[in-house]
């Protein structure tokens, strides 16, 4: 079996590459996915409101666990990653958030990353997107990713929470992906006009599946990348339950798109990574790159939960006897509660003046429940998810053996710096001030969590240690750049090797201010043009907000 390109991982990035590369009819592509198909009749992945379900099983979730996190009471924390066509876009929360313009301008300050500025990236965000209310300078109108905007008549709690943020002195913004990210406003979601999850399997692969030059193999677990000297020449993978590997050869390039946990793991297993680690595991060294698996970053978040005095929350939707009607309305009409991820409002603020752009993100949810669907409060309630955006803490991913079925050792090293603790204390206190605003007076009942007795720095820190959870945004473990810890250059090419790129969230040099999926897709769109040797899309000329001397909060 020989192909021009072999793509490892049919996730948010891999499906973009598979679709774009096979637009050239003379180019053959093999797309390998360790998980199974994205079954379109499975409401768990297709119904936006069911987003908690795929995280609970193993069919669509790798369900990794971290090593005991030293600053988090030594908890082993969950690290869910998507498995199946679509990757994490098949199980994520569907929030369409791109990050702040300053994130990309900051990336572009690093040598070799000059063309990753916001105005260089914006055309690729637009290329990927079809926004339901039409294109403008910031949004696309004919891309593969369906983006749905919140509509009039949605839950009144969304509007009350945004108003409360504005009353507390923070900006209002009409579009968190537009001119100004900073502030509170409506949040877009990756959902189709028919109310289905817009994974990259649906948006991208559906265009490409029928092409004769694309072969998709599911249940194909990559064992390792094969090299001839310093050149990647193919991939060995295990098909289904098979004990023997299947080999495929790549004439041009191997494209590793397995995500921030699996991509460094596959590189290390293939002999690319820190020499001491590979020697310890008796893995033959192909090329020493000390940064493979290092620089791991994530977002941590907490829930602040309140009882709701007015019976307008989604609590009734959690009761089994109401669910058949919700399911039927979604199935047949593509509308109703089932068609939304219920994260229809949120925002970004600066907790202190020293931050040049927002460092805290909010998601508002009109029900009191854990992200994975557990511990639902048995009454009407609402909550704010809040967390810091650019933690200075750094973790790592390390392969434990040559066995591709063994999960790696993962340590995020959450909350390792004083800045982390300061940001979370600030975030809880600011959230309480927002929740105390008049806009929420008719809704706000008692504080359920953390609870009104949790007030001192020590009490807040203890709450964070015990209750903060991942936002499922692992990234940066094979970072782009030119320094000694960089793994790839600005086009995703692995340093010191030929015919091998990494294209996924692992190559972000620094984590972005917001959810990762939209940016992961943009990265793949941008590098796809590089692989095809096409002229990059012309830079955008859109103007965008920079806070400058503007106060973080009006008094």
From Swiss-Prot:
Enzyme class label: oxidoreductase
GO molecular function: betaine-aldehyde dehydrogenase (NAD+) activity; choline dehydrogenase activity; flavin adenine dinucleotide binding
EC number(s) reported in the record: 1.1.99.1, 1.2.1.8
Taxonomic superkingdom: Bacteria
Coiled coil: none
Annotated Gene Ontology cellular component terms: membrane
Cofactor requirements of the protein: FAD
Residues binding FAD: 4-33
Active site: 473 (proton acceptor)
Catalyses which reaction(s): choline + A = betaine aldehyde + AH2; betaine aldehyde + NAD(+) + H2O = glycine betaine + NADH + 2 H(+)
Any one GO biological process: glycine betaine biosynthetic process from choline
Annotated region described as Disordered, given as residue ranges: 180-202
Keywords: FAD, Flavoprotein, NAD, Oxidoreductase
Similarity remark: Belongs to the GMC oxidoreductase family.
Purpose of the protein: Involved in the biosynthesis of the osmoprotectant glycine betaine. Catalyzes the oxidation of choline to betaine aldehyde and betaine aldehyde to glycine betaine at the same rate.
Protein name: Oxygen-dependent choline dehydrogenase
Natural source organism: Serratia proteamaculans (strain 568)
Lineage: Bacteria, Pseudomonadati, Pseudomonadota, Gammaproteobacteria, Enterobacterales
Gene: betA
